[in-house]
């Protein structure tokens, strides 16, 4: 009996010791890389030792979490809802990349094979990606894949497979999803399962790279991309990496112009110069989103990504690596000992400061615009209810893949820096609860911040002739001040006693102050943060106005300009005399709504300098006008524009001097929606570099909706690539003529619409060029195009009916995964009637043509078909001569 008890005791001791040895081995294996990483740093030796000792706590967390992941259970029979990426990699290559970090991580690409969606396997190159040790763990590394030009993957030559950084795996993905819904440029990202050498590695984010392919995936014009990840306190041009298409740099250096605006002396002109190169709307949306999701990853020194859009002449920010929804807001290592492990909620409205944001926030119009976008997000796209529903749907999709991922780990700040911490399925489920709780509290906090808007006032009779109203606005949101009921003569006064008459509804902005950084203890990023303050406004009212009635009217004259809530002002009873030197606002700080209309004609109008119609203004050209344009002079309208010609009284836009071409006529931007050109002849123009943008079309239509043009002629341009250029717009163009075109007669880029009854004659290049556009064309005649009658490229979707292409080099060309359906058409006396081929390697193939009831007459070649092209010919179409390696099929 005693022997049996001793035997059981020894067994229990053995099991206990074995368990302790296992735990100890986990702790040692966790502590070793932490200590090694710290001892490789430049910190003093005593600090390294102390940090390593403290890191034993982190090692304990890692060790126990590792044990929990081993014990995880999941249902292997659950259906998988996300696509697979399957890589076969060079043996030992992952270990080589991890052998001498950080230098070995990205020093070379290794060979691999990638399974494509069509079931074919192609050779690719791969390496680690990322800037931290978190992304270089051999168990689940973040990777960059490079394909050959011959075999792009989903139209990408470069793409990234990124190990998600948060426990819920959504902080970057969902931030980018929200950005896309809000119209902010961002990466195209999706969840995938990654298999390496037939072994499941885990859940990844498949995402585009910071390059031209990312822009094309977002239907944006290729242009310069600026990457700022190693910036000094004062930004300089050479601190940014420049990528993408740099053709725009021939005319200007957009980033240098932006930097000059940032560091110019503070003034109204400085703010104007900032918004002349930076899109105020896009930057306001960008910062509203950062505020919504608590994104503090973009700071003074890194995570800055910008794109210069050549079609708009403006820089805009790109959402990338946003690390939102609390990822970087968890307690620090020391705080974890006394605080719950939950993300901080009350990141200030203005977030982390940086040189660009610092200047932008000093413009009250920008703050107001940012606040309006934020309020819209909080009540619509980014409301708690909407975010919760969308995330629940997303989790349902990724749950089966996440639960079987035994390599999942998240970023956590440890005593030696940010580190990769494994977590279990239980912790994954708990992270969802934490995120929903954070979103709800964050939204409540932001709504309170936007509701923070207060008004106080004082009425002063400083003489028998003058009653002064002093108004102080304080808080985060601007205030609407309704002057109706205050009499006919209300003036605003500035510090110099200058007066300006005002009326109706006016917007009053609060002040802004530099305040101590209190919310990031121990993590000083900037010397100060910009926060809410007060601003004084001074008004002069009729001296005969009854004071009691005035007080009564003022009680309902103010409301929050963001939330719309009424503001009850407080009457303060200071006895001090008014010191006008304290009134530091200018009259223009009180914003009034204006809608200026510019009218040209009728009769002869001579333009000897550029005419710019600004946002919110309108241009009307009267019937019977003749606009004579001097050498190089242009007309750019950013407001609604009406060329109001009639058959009896048409409009002409032509040269003032027959030998000197004018520049361009351009209609640009969302405020120009609904512009109309009718019964107008444009002739003799060229091109122009205007407002940071090279306009390639004599007549240019860009970034507008519902553009209408009919009964017009566009002809005889010089120098410019296009006679009419339409980009990022919707349109209908009918009953018009285009002739003697220096390049393409019409160029449609990223646009959609209808064209009807057009005659195109003598284009030196293409009759009509389509890129990434959707157009329905009917009754079009193209004669004598020097290159192509119709050029259909870059995934365009075009339908052509009842049309004719005659005497052109190529009648119709279809390229780069475009789709053309052509019906009831005649192609005659062309060198090649139809050609279908690949031009841009990114698209991975030539495309498709559907031919119905088309007549081929006297062409040298009827069809030239590249291998892999799809050509369907319906019964009744006779094809005489074909060339190329491809073939066509008959549809009966």
Where are these regions (language model features)?
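N-terminal Sec-pathway targeting helices
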Residues: 2-21
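Conserved NTP-binding catalytic cores of kinases and kinase-like/nucleotidyltransferase enzymes
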Residues: 23-174
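Middle-to-C-terminal accessory/interaction subdomains
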Residues: 32-35, 119, 260-295, 299, ...
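Second-shell loop/turn segments in exported
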Residues: 158-167, 242-246, 271-278, 356-359
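Internal "kinase-insert"/substrate-recognition segments embedded within catalytic cores
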Residues: 184-187, 199-288
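Short acidic, flexible loop segments centered on an aromatic residue
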Residues: 477-497
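Beta-strand/loop edge motif enriched in small/polar residues
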Residues: 499-892
């Amino acid at each position: 009996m005693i022997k049996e008890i001793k035997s059981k005791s020894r067994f229990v001791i053995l099991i206990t010791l074995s368990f302790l040895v296992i735990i100890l081995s986990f702790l040692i294996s966790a502590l070793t890389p932490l200590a090694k990483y710290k001892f490789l740093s430049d910190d003093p030796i005593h600090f390294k030792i102390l940090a390593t000792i403290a890191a034993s706590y982190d090692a304990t967390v890692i060790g126990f979490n590792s044990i929990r992941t081993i014990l995880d259970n999941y249902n292997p029979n659950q259906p998988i809802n996300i696509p697979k990426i399957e890589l076969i990699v060079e043996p030992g290559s992952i270990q080589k990349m991890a052998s001498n970090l950080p230098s070995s991580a990205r020093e070379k690409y290794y060979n691999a094979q990638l399974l494509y969606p069509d079931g074919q396997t192609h050779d690719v190159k791969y390496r680690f990606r990322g800037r931290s040790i978190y992304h270089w763990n051999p168990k689940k590394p973040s990777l960059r894949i490079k394909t050959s030009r011959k075999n792009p993957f989903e139209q990408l030559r470069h793409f990234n497979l990124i190990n998600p950084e948060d426990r819920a795996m959504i902080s970057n993905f969902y931030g980018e999803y929200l950005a896309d819904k809000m119209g902010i440029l961002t990466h195209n990202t999706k969840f995938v399962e990654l298999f390496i050498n037939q072994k499941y590695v885990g859940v990844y984010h498949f995402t585009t790279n910071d390059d031209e392919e990312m822009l094309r995936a977002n239907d944006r014009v290729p242009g310069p991309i600026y990457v700022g990840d190693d910036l000094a306190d004062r930004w300089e041009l050479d601190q940014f990496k420049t990528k993408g298409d740099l053709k725009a740099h021939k005319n200007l250096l957009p980033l240098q112009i932006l930097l000059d605006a940032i560091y110019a002396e503070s003034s109204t002109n400085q703010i104007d110069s900032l918004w002349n190169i930076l899109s105020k709307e896009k930057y306001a949306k960008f910062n509203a989103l950062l505020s919504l999701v608590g994104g503090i990853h973009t700071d003074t020194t890194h995570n800055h990504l910008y794109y210069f859009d050549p079609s708009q002449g403006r820089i805009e920010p790109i959402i990338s690596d946003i690390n939102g929804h609390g990822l970087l807001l968890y307690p620090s290592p020391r705080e974890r000992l006394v605080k719950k492990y939950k993300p901080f909620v009350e990141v200030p409205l203005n977030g982390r400061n940086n040189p660009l944001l610092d200047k932008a926030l000093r413009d009250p119009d920008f703050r107001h615009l940012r606040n309006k976008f934020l309020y819209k997000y909080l009540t619509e796209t980014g409301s708690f209810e909407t975010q919760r529903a969308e995330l629940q749907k997303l989790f349902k999709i990724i749950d089966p893949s996440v639960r079987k991922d035994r390599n999942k780990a998240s970023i956590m700040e440890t005593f030696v820096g940010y580190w990769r911490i494994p977590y279990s399925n239980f912790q994954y489920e708990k992270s969802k609860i934490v995120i929903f709780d954070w979103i709800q509290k964050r939204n409540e906090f932001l709504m309170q911040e936007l509701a923070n808007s207060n008004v106080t006032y004082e009425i002063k009779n400083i003489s028998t002739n003058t009653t002064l109203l002093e108004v102080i606005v304080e808080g985060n949101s601007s205030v609407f001040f309704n002057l109706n009921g205050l009499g006919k003569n209300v003036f605003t006064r500035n510090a110099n006693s200058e007066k300006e008459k005002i009326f109706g509804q006016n917007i009053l902005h609060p002040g802004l102050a530099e305040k101590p950084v209190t919310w990031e203890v121990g993590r000083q990023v900037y010397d100060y943060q910009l926060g809410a303050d007060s601003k004084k406004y001074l008004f002069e009212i009729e001296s005969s106005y009854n004071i009691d009635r005035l007080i009564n009217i003022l009680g309902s004259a103010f409301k929050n300009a963001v939330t719309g809530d009424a503001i009850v002002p407080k009457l303060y009873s200071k006895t001090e005399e008014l010191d006008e030197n304290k009134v530091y606002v200018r009259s223009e700080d009180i914003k009034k709504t204006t809608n200026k209309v510019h009218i040209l004609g009728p009769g002869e109008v001579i333009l000897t300098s550029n005419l710019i119609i600004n946002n919110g203004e309108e241009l009307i050209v009267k019937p019977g006008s003749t606009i004579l344009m001097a050498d190089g002079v242009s007309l750019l309208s950013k407001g609604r524009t009406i060329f109001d010609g009639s058959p009896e009284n048409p409009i002409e836009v032509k040269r003032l001097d027959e030998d000197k071409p004018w520049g361009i006529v351009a209609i640009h931007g969302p405020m120009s929606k609904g512009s109309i050109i009718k019964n107008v002849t444009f002739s003799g123009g060229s091109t122009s570099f205007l407002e940071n943008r090279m306009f390639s079309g004599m007549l240019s239509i860009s970034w507008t909706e519902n553009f209408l043009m009919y009964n017009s002629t566009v002809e005889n341009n010089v120098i410019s690539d296009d006679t009419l250029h339409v980009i990022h717009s919707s349109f209908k163009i009918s009953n018009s003529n285009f002739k003697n075109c220096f390049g393409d007669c019409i160029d449609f880029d990223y646009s959609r619409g209808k064209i009807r009854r057009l005659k195109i004659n003598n284009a030196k290049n293409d009759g009509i060029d389509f890129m990434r556009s959707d157009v329905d064309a009917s009754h079009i005649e193209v004669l004598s195009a020097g290159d192509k009658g119709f050029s259909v490229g870059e995934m365009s979707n075009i339908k052509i009916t009842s049309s004719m292409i005659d005497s052109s080099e190529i009648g119709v060309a279809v390229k780069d995964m475009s789709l053309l359906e052509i019906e009831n058409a005649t192609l005659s006396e062309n060198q090649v009637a139809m050609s279908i081929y690949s031009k841009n390697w990114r698209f991975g193939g030539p495309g498709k043509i559907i031919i119905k009831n088309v007549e081929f007459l006297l062409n040298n070649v009827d069809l030239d078909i590249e291998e892999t092209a799809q050509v369907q010919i319906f019964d009744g179409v006779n094809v005489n001569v074909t060339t190329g390696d491809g073939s066509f099929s008959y549809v009966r």
